[in-house]
Design a protein with these regions (language model features):
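Bacterial Sec-dependent N-terminal signal peptides
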Residues: 1-22
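An acidic-aromatic substrate-binding cleft motif
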Residues: 248-324, 328
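Aromatic- and carboxylate-enriched substrate-binding clefts and catalytic-loop regions
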Residues: 335-507
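Catalytic cores of secreted or luminal carbohydrate-active enzymes
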Residues: 509-555
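Carbohydrate-binding surface patches
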Residues: 559-595, 639-640
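C-terminal beta-strand-rich structural cap/linker in extracellular carbohydrate-active enzymes
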Residues: 620-647
Length: 647
């Protein structure tokens, strides 16, 4: 990150005898206003354009026998920051501006920082003394003062896959013995309010438990006893300590974040979680990080045919995939489960010659990525990553963590550090959603934490409605490995689960639009080469879509209904529209691209796509300056347009 502009106002420091009990601060655009009260217990409330967003929300942190946030504030400082940020791995933008106002409450051994952005507010505790006591409890509340519709991912287990269905209900109608994976969305009048966390290190991740007109933070205590299960494939925490982390130390704690947006589309512009997160070390070199598309073997069950060898988990299959990737300019091939012994990454499956595959792939200009369950990485990280590097492996996909207590959060960072040392890209699956660690470690390319395409192999949960909720909620916090690319497409009445030859819900154009709409610097190409060879028109579109973006322009949409946006990579614009369950006609204003006619090549729903989901067309359109782009979509449909700007 380059710091181009930094503006720091003079800090206003007040002696403890004159410290105000009520402090008010606004966002740079003055639309968001936070009111902080310091009497007895610190609390805050929040409004936007005069509309109450959050009612009085108390906060505290229990360290040893002390409860921070309940003693006397000694001093208050304020500052304003406007700072240009350049992304090492661009997700939405090549660059943006980190612009906020900050209020800092200073106490004897700690501080509480509040930051007010144009798209939200956040606060965190900062320990300023090397406190050796355990952190026992944190009190986090988001109180709305009224009942509102919420979008939650409910569970009753601290150990889970972070892959729940969205529950859309008023807060007061939610079961109070459950809690939600973050982010949670609450609709307050016309505003979309998102609750999450940022900069999570050496601390448990936050769940959100519904209460009367509010949500409260829930955290997993530190593990005590851990036992293997599912044939040593996973580790279950059977008992936990009576604290969150064993030692407080001198440190910053995670940000508690409230994003506030005027409409659904404005969520798509926000990089708030990233901006609140710790930067990479100045000297750290990540020029080797290479985003791209990944040919993946597992989803399609290596179902390749019209070939002269037996496909499966074997060397011939992976050499074939390398050849296919090289032919079609796909950057990576992911070798999923089965290439090594079940519990030993250094003992190869005799049918899979990893050194030979890697050597061959290197000559072809293709990178190899390897899958592993996390328990093997935990046990063999040093030896395995060193060996991967010697083989020429370019990335790892690590799976089945299924928890977010502090010990597991530390594992994520240990992976990031060691993977950086050996120049390995990382894709976390069975993972909690993003919380900003990718800013400090840009080789953390993507992660799951979402119901994605894999669910179509065994369930009907990856619906077209789900597909137009997740870009507004899950994707707000960071890259999302949904793994699109299905060539067998069906509507609900003809869809069925199939492990060997899976399909997707929604139309072919619905699938293709995911490559523009869903953000993931490593983007999977999930179906088999045989399927792509039979559907070359669609495959050519997939191949032509980049995985990182210089600019993003939200166009229109509603949560659970549809999403339309434009993205630019170099001088080419891409239009992506994903539709939900209802047929839809929209008209898009393209004036943001500039003057002159726009020549568009588009992948659209065919005229019979409402009946046959595979029906699609490739068309060419020319849109003049005084015209809008008309888009007609089937139920579960989509649209992808590519606009080359002629200079």
């Amino acid at each position: 990150m380059n710091h181009i502009l930094f503006l720091l106002t003079a800090a206003f420091c007040f002696p403890s005898i004159t410290v105000a009990k009520i402090i008010e601060a606004g966002s740079p655009d003055k639309k968001n206003v936070i009111t902080i009260e310091t009497d007895n217990q610190v609390s805050y409330s929040l409004s936007r354009n005069g509309t109450k967003i959050l009612d009085t929300c108390p906060l505290s942190l229990t360290v040893g026998n002390d409860t921070w946030g309940t003693d006397k504030c000694r001093k208050i400082t304020r500052k304003s920051v406007s700072e240009k940020v350049e992304f090492i791995v661009p997700r939405k933008y090549k660059e943006t501006v980190d612009n906020y106002n900050q209020v800092e409450l200073i106490y004897k051994d700690y501080k509480i920082e509040f930051r007010i952005y144009n798209d939200g507010v956040a606060y965190r505790f900062v320990s300023t003394a090397n406190n050796k006591q355990p952190v026992k409890k944190e009190s986090v509340s988001f109180r709305f003062g009224q009942d509102h519709t919420s979008y939650t991912l409910l569970t009753d287990q601290l150990q889970n896959w972070f892959e729940q269905d969205y529950t859309v209900k008023p807060i007061n109608a939610l079961p109070k013995d459950s809690f939600s994976v973050a982010p949670v969305m609450v609709e307050v009048d016309k505003y979309k309010v998102l609750l999450a966390e940022a900069n999570l290190y050496n601390y448990p991740g936050m769940y959100l438990q519904p209460a009367l007109e509010s949500f409260h933070g829930i955290f997993a205590n530190y593990p005590d006893k851990e036992v293997p299960y599912e044939g040593d494939n996973k580790i279950y925490v059977s008992t936990r300590k009576d604290y969150l982390i064993p030692t407080c130390g001198k440190r910053v704690f995670p940000w508690r974040v409230t994003g506030i947006f005027d409409n659904a589309s404005s969520i798509l512009q926000s990089e708030l979680i990233y901006l609140l997160s710790e930067e990479k070390e100045q000297a750290a070199d990540y020029t080797w990080v290479k985003p791209g598309k990944v040919l993946w073997d597992w989803w399609n069950d290596r179902n390749i045919y019209h070939i002269n060898f037996k496909s499966g988990i074997n060397t011939d299959t992976y050499l074939y995939l390398v050849d296919y990737a090289a032919k079609h300019h796909i950057e990576y091939v992911l070798i999923d489960e089965g290439w090594s012994a079940r519990n030993d990454l250094l003992t190869l499956n005799p049918d899979v010659d990893i050194p030979r595959i890697c050597e061959y792939a290197t000559k072809k200009g293709v990178g190899i990525q390897l899958w592993s369950k996390w328990v093997n990485i935990m046990r063999q990280m040093d030896e395995a990553f060193a060996q991967f590097s010697k083989w020429g492996v370019k990335g790892v996909k690590i799976d089945f963590m299924d928890r977010n207590d502090a010990k597991m959060v530390n594992f994520y960072e240990q992976v990031a550090i060691k993977a950086t040392q050996y120049k390995l890209l990382v894709d976390f699956h069975g993972s909690y959603p993003n919380e900003g660690m990718r800013r400090k470690y840009p080789n953390l390319m993507t992660r799951e934490g979402v119901i994605g395409l894999e669910y179509n192999k065994w369930s009907k949960r990856a619906t077209v409605t789900h597909d137009v909720i997740i870009p507004y909620l899950r994707m707000w916090v960071g890259p999302m490995d949904y793994t699109p690319g299905a060539m067998l497409n069906a509507h609900p009445e003809t869809f069925y689960e199939n492990q060997h030859e899976p399909m997707s819900q929604g139309t072919r154009s619905h699938q293709l639009a995911m490559y523009v709409v869903y953000e993931s610097p490593l983007q999977m190409i999930s179906d088999s080469p045989t399927k792509y060879d039979k559907n070359l028109r669609s495959f050519e579109f997939i191949k032509s879509i980049p995985t990182t973006w210089d600019e993003t322009v939200p166009l229109e949409g509603e949560v659970g209904e549809y999403i339309a946006l434009a993205r630019r990579h170099n001088d080419t614009w891409y239009i992506g529209v994903i539709n939900g369950a209802t047929p839809r006609h929209i008209e898009i204003d393209l004036s943001f691209i500039g003057n002159g006619p726009k020549k568009i090549k588009a992948h659209i729903d065919g005229v019979n796509a409402g009946q046959q989901a595979k029906d699609s067309q490739i068309i060419e359109q020319v849109i003049k300056d005084n015209e809008k782009l008309p888009i007609d979509m089937s139920r579960g449909g989509g649209y992808t347009g590519i606009i080359h700007i002629e200079k």
